[in-house]
Structures are given as structure tokens and as C-alpha cells.
């Protein structure tokens, strides 16, 4: 199990070890740590057979033809905002799960889900900084909001208006701050008020 092959693209195409065009130190690191098969070509080439597309780029980067050539029942996170890499209505019938950064479609993935809770949790314990353990705690808290029996293709992440999210994130972030040693306030004996 686990991710075995990640292929990233930029405006030039696939990022791979040995590529010389439009590279910098970040892309060099990426090339050395992903794309083990050194896939080359455009985004349309490398998305063929892919299980997941995670877009963080620009509107219209992929189309329904690309979705048809992905693996069966692909997952598409088209995060460009306000216009995603592919519009959800264009993906209907071609994907198992679709998510965007937009509030007017199901499965909005937005950092507003984590920030109120992260800040509250950090402030509750007077954390000296926000570290990776606290960020992971926030992500896990968000993931745990939806019960397994509630999950379905249009409900993989809680709404930004779900009041449970900030409280759950704050509690888990505060715990992680104590466990990772960045809390500067003694842990309260009773639950910290939200």
C-alpha cells in the first residue's frame, strides 16, 4: 500500500531526474525524490493511467479526455481558485471523487478548515511555534470529523461551516503541542475551554 509514483508537472511538462529545461533547486529536489520511472511529456501524457490528479496550478489544465484516460474511478482534486483545473460539472461521470477549493461545490478543500483551530490550540497552551506534529494533529482531527459510515463521493471532508471542526482541531493541536514540547503553559487539569 501507499503512494509509489508521484509525477509533478510545471508549465514545461513532467519534472524528472535529468531534465535540464526550466529547472531550479526546488525542482531538482522534486525530480530526485519523485517520478521513479522518469516519465516525460506534458501533463496530458503523464496523467494517463493515473489514479489521482492533484492540481495546484491554473484553470483548464486538464479536460474530460484526460479523465477518460486515467485509471478507472480516479480521484481529482482540482484546487486552482476561483476556476479549477477542470470544472466539477465536466468531471461528472468520469471520476469517483471530485474536490475543489470552491465553496459552491461539494468537497471544498480550504485552509479555513484548519486555521481557527490551529490558532486556538496554540494559544491555549502558549505554544512557542506551530510545528509539524501540530499540523498533522490538525489534519487528523479534520479527517476524523466524518464518520466512516457518512463518507460518500460528495462528502469526503467536513464543511467549513461545521462547528465541530475548530473545536476538534484546537484540542488535538493543543495535545500535540504538549506532546512535542512546544507548549509553554502547564497543562490544565480540566478540559481547556474552547
Which residue stretches match the model-derived regions?
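Short acidic, glycine/serine/threonine-rich loops at helix termini
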Residues: 1, 17-22, 65-67, 87-92, ...
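Short glycine/threonine-rich loop-to-helix capping motif typified by GTGT followed
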Residues: 1, 59, 67, 163-168
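Glycine-rich phosphate/diphosphate-binding loop of Rossmann-like nucleotide-binding domains
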Residues: 1-58
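Secondary-structure transition/capping motifs at alpha-helix termini
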Residues: 2-6, 70-73, 94, 98
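Long hydrophobic segments that form regular secondary structure
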Residues: 39-93
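Adenosine-phosphate binding glycine-rich loop
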Residues: 78-187
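Long, charged amphipathic helices and adjacent flexible linkers at domain junctions
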Residues: 187-194
